């Protein structure tokens, strides 16, 4: 009894000791765990604060990036609108330039055709000019031969002044005008008077469209009427195809003293008179027959 009781007591003591040791171990372990947990919580809290600060910075950066993205989107939309407007503007300019180029090409073609026409016309005019120069040279040779023959037949001893002739060239629209000058016949008994005659003809396409003859000279006053009649008769006699009613004759009389150095003339001697005869014929009148041309 006593042994079993003793063993029970010993067992109870050991159990108490074990329980106490377990409690102390548990308490120490718990305390260590609490300390470790507290340290870990502190670290976690610091990490949390750092994470919160980092999150705050990230949120700030995100907000800044969001604003920048919106600004870039606005810039993108503006650039797209500007690009679209530029495309439309340059498209319109391109269309205008294409129209201008097309017009210039047409104008260039017209200019080329005009140049070709002008070259053809120039060639035709050049050929016509050469032909007319040949005809003029032929007429000049004929006139020179006629003048040589006419003045060679005049008897010597009388002081004669050679009639003057003039040749003037001019252009009428769409035609080439050739002017031919020749001297008309002077009555034999007035050959000692100073008389000059000039006849001008304007020829269009081989037809005479305008003709004028002018003769003037200084004669004695008493012979004015006689000279005028002689000139008129000689003119129509030399040109039988003309009719008096188709020709306009005009006589201009000018008083002119033969001796200009004298201030006064004698009363018994009348001063000489300058007489000018002008004939004009329109295109409706038959043309004067030209002399036949021979080489």
From Swiss-Prot:
Gene Ontology CC entries for this record: intermediate filament
Claim: Repeat is one of the keywords in the record: no
Keyword Coiled coil: yes
GO function terms (MF aspect): structural molecule activity
InterPro entries xrefs: IF_conserved, IF_Keratin-like, IF_rod_dom, Keratin_I
Coiled coil regions in record: 1-151
Residue span, IF rod domain: 1-150
Keywords, sorted A to Z: Coiled coil, Intermediate filament, Keratin
Family classification: Belongs to the intermediate filament family.
Protein name (Swiss-Prot/TrEMBL): Keratin-like protein KRT222
Lineage, top ranks: Eukaryota, Metazoa, Chordata, Craniata, Vertebrata
């Amino acid at each position: 009894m006593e042994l079993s009781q003793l063993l029970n007591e010993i067992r109870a003591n050991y159990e108490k000791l074990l329980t106490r040791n377990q409690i102390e171990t548990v308490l120490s372990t718990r305390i260590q765990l609490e300390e470790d947990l507290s340290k870990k919580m502190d670290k976690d809290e610091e990490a949390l604060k750092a994470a919160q600060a980092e999150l705050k910075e990230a949120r700030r950066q995100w907000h800044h990036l969001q604003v920048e993205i919106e600004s870039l989107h606005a810039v993108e939309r503006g650039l797209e609108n500007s690009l679209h407007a530029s495309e439309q503007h340059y498209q319109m300019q391109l269309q205008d330039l294409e129209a201008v180029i097309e017009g210039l090409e047409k104008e260039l073609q017209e200019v080329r055709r005009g140049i070709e026409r002008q070259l053809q016309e120039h060639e035709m005019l050049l050929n016509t000019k050469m032909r007319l120069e040949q005809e003029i040279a032929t007429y000049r040779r004929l006139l020179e031969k006629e003048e040589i023959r006419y003045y060679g037949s005049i008897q010597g001893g009388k002081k004669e002044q050679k009639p003057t002739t003039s040749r003037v060239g001019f252009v009428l629209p769409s035609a080439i005008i050739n002017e031919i000058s020749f001297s008309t016949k002077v009555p034999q008994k007035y050959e000692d008077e100073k008389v000059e005659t000039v006849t001008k003809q304007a020829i269009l396409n081989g037809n005479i469209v305008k003709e004028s003859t002018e003769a003037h000279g200084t004669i004695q006053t008493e012979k004015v009427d006689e000279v005028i009649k002689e000139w008129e008769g000689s003119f129509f006699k030399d040109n039988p195809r003309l009719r008096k009613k188709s020709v306009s004759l005009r006589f201009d009389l000018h008083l002119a003293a033969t001796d200009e150095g004298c201030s006064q003339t004698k009363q018994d001697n009348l001063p000489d008179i300058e007489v000018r005869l002008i004939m004009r014929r329109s295109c409706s009148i038959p043309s004067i027959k030209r002399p036949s041309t021979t080489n």
